[in-house]
Amino acid sequence: MNDFWQHCSALLERELTPQQYVTWIKPLAPVAFDAAANTLSIAAPNRFKLDWVKSQFSGRISDLARDFWNAPIEVQFVLDPKAGQRSPAGATPLAPRAPLPSANPAPVGPGPACAPAVDAHAPAPAGMNAATAAAVAAAQAAQAAQANAAALNADEAADLDLPSLTAHEAAAGRRTWRPGAANANSEAADSMYERSKLNPVLTFDNFVTGKANQLARAAAIQVADNPGISYNPLFLYGGVGLGKTHLIHAIGNQLLLDKPGARIRYIHAEQYVSDVVKAYQRKAFDDFKRYYHSLDLLLIDDIQFFSGKSRTQEEFFYAFEALVANKAQVIITSDTYPKEISGIDDRLISRFDSGLTVAIEPPELEMRVAILMRKAQSEGVSLSEDVAFFVAKHLRSNVRELEGALRKILAYSKFHGREITIELTKEALKDLLTVQNRQISVENIQKTVADFYNIKVADMYSKKRPANIARPRQIAMYLAKELTQKSLPEIGELFGGRDHTTVLHAVRKIADERGKDAQLNHELHVLEQTLKG
């Protein structure tokens, strides 16, 4: 059994990336082999890794086992029985955090769930002076008030989408799950993901990387490795369906692997707004603040939904300040550059700018092809590069659109019982391709760019060469090449009969400068989003 596992591990180490091998294969261990039943049991340190390895690697491990023993082997994945007694390899438990002060909890009436009352007028114990006794009584009263408030937390938390707190951990500003406890059994592991609201499927391993998102991915990995130290806050912005949500879930999932006791919460901005409203209605801001201020990692998606909501912004500002002061990590996403989000308080904008702001651009052609090929592979379908290239060339906006198109192609192929070819793809995507071709034209690009740079549309066709005209013209040529199916000669003809070499020079010049000039990159991003509607 051990000989097989050494053989299997060595092969998988060569087949996988170093990150995949260390994250998923190295923590596994063979625990039993039944020669009579031809079953091999492999232990995983926690439920998350067990489920992922079972879904992604069980087939390959079964094949290797069959080859090794020259017989069909049933590979079973089980939780390591010792997982609850130790932290996973490489995991670093989080240091305890200092208790957070209570935000003046309201008095709570007596009842079976309340802490015993403290008599401030009771005689001081022997040997204790009056001043010391008063201080002790005050501390006991504060502790009792916190315990009383915590007794109601379960009901309030259910309404506010907050995990319930025990009296002890509410007083300490901490949630009920502890470092290492998440690995004790599958129920605890499932609870860990339920509390954090993370999607365990969204990881760095299955995030397709290209020029459009490589900086964002690098920053995300750096933050996952050094939360609260590198880039705090990390602000990711870009259009719909470009992978912002995938990346922030990947950060959370990686941190849970490295530090299973981490207090993590993913939340969409709309849910945060809803929680603020409910906390206000129920006078439950104590619980709200205690929960959010005690996190180790807060992932907040689509913060543009805070626009115009002053009370939400105020509460988030206080949470942000508390988290950063405690060296907790904050990660934010938006569809817009921070300074261009309307209706957001200047204090928040300045906090967003204090960390690292990274744009995620629409995927380039090669990346779109890679996304389609990987998605098809995950669906168990063989997709030719010709078909992937055809789809990627015609659909340019975002990953969700590509995945939706692929699902449509697969369904069309299955329904008609035909092989996936370019002809079938054209039939399956007929309506979508028609809409795409109708939406963006060279004329529309010229008008949009002219309006953006405050020049006349006629300047696009003219022979004028001042920088304030030549530059927008080159940008329009670049966008025409990127966003339409026109050839270089056709684009040149639409720009006043220019030669195709002039268009090629403009396209190469803008493409090269885009990678070096952050301002130009931002302007192009805005124009692309405007043209795509």
Swiss-Prot record:
Residues 83-110 are annotated as: Disordered. It is found in: Cytoplasm. Residues 1-72 are annotated as: Domain I, interacts with DnaA modulators. Residues 96-110 have a biased composition (Pro residues). The keyword Secreted does not apply. Residues 197-413 are annotated as: Domain III, AAA+ region. GO terms for cellular component: cytoplasm; plasma membrane. SUPFAM superfamilies: P-loop containing nucleoside triphosphate hydrolases, TrpR-like. InterPro entries: AAA+_ATPase, Chromosome_initiator_DnaA, Chromosome_initiator_DnaA-like, Chromosome_initiator_DnaA_CS, DnaA_C, DnaA_dom, DnaA_N_dom, DnaA_N_sf. One of its GO terms (molecular function) is ATP binding. Belongs to the DnaA family. Domain I is involved in oligomerization and binding regulators, domain II is flexibile and of varying length in different bacteria, domain III forms the AAA+ region, while domain IV binds dsDNA. This is Chromosomal replication initiator protein DnaA. It comes from Burkholderia mallei (strain NCTC 10229). The lineage of its organism: Bacteria, Pseudomonadati, Pseudomonadota, Betaproteobacteria, Burkholderiales. The gene is dnaA.
